[in-house]
């Protein structure tokens, strides 16, 4: 069955999250290296990324701290400047090639306005906060299928995480494409291709060829 639609994760797939995490480190008054190393240790033991906050600041109320940051004018979501250089080029190339293209990830609802402002005709722009469903919940991928109206095998899902992207997408019947970049990708899979992935790439420049090989 040929692939008709391609849906992308956000963080470390399309967007470089270095500045987002770095801004949190600055807000907490923690050296960025310390924050990043602690985050890496949480990822390595299979923990949730939010666990980094009580490690660095015991007793933190993360929701309250997030509201305080927003009130202070700090970033609440990704920005256009955070996109990897290959991201928009890839999105436009896929649309021009005739693919239906969407973006859906574990993100705050504010991210949707940034994604919707891209100069790319996207068929789907969705955040976990708006849907009320978070990856790796199978319902997240079922929602993608319902929204696009294709068979699961006609949809490719591109993501950097083995646990949140590759495995659940494959279990849902989508074609899972693993992009090897960002801390989750290298810590979870190293240089070996995840067994559940239909294809693995090192940059989005390689995606069109990967899709052609799967069709």
Identify the meaning behind each predicted range.
Residues 1-99, 108-112:
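N-terminal helical cap/lid subdomain that shapes the substrate entry/recognition surface
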Residues 1-7, 63, 88-215:
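Asp-based, Mg2+/Mn2+-dependent phosphohydrolase catalytic module
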């Amino acid at each position: 069955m040929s692939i008709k639609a391609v849906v992308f994760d956000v963080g470390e797939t399309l967007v470089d999250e270095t500045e987002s995490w770095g801004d949190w480190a600055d807000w907490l008054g923690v050296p960025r290296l310390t924050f990043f190393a602690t985050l890496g240790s949480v990822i390595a033991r299979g923990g949730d990324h939010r666990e980094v906050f009580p490690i660095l600041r015991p007793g933190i109320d993360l929701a309250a701290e997030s509201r305080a940051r927003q009130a202070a004018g700090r970033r609440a979501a990704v920005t256009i400047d955070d996109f990897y250089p290959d991201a928009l080029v890839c999105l436009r190339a896929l649309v021009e090639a005739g693919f239906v293209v969407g973006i859906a990830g574990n993100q705050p609802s504010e991210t949707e306005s940034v994604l919707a402002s891209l100069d790319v005709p996207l068929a789907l722009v969705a955040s976990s906060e708006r849907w009320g469903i978070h990856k790796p919940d199978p319902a997240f991928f079922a929602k993608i299928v319902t929204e696009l109206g294709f068979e699961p095998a006609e949809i490719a899902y591109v993501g950097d995480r083995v646990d949140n992207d590759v495995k659940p997408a494959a279990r849902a019947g989508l074609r899972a494409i693993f992009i090897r970049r960002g801390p989750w990708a290298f810590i979870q899979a190293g240089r070996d291709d995840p067994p559940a992935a239909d294809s693995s790439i090192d940059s989005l420049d390689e995606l069109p060829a990967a899709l052609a090989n799967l069709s």
